[in-house]
């Protein structure tokens, strides 16, 4: 008989609603999250709208500590993780931390951080890059920062399989629970809206 695996908490940040109640309400009412972009200049582009999360303030959810060097993608996923943990009433303890895992799906990772870091290295020279910002350029940085912030000491995996990354992460997590590799898993996906991702789709 297959093991019963359940979802106990949900954390969501989306352009049409942050928090599961707001997001579900928007879906039921058919409210779109597509708005004018404010994160970067679109004046020279034909398209000026996207699904942007407006007025995002990670500190209001997480407090100011440890946020200064994190990029937007990592902040988004840490807030979503906190919302999910709170919704599940799940507290990571010394007793369960090694049996708790993290699986995160992403298509492009922290593409803004990668681009900005490389731009500085190419234009100004490698010695002018800020080494403190380098961790943001690694694709598994957001997932790793979840484990660091919430002291999760079980396995930590980033799935990058294109547009199915988050679904693949969910399947990966389900398998690990089925195989008794973990008792609880924080699983999700993240993509940030930035100029680089916008241009990628704009050029299609």
What does each model-identified segment do?
Residues 10, 105-107:
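Structured loops at beta-to-helix junctions and adjacent beta-edge loops in soluble globular domains
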Residues 1-66:
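ACP-dependent fatty acid/polyketide chain-elongation machinery
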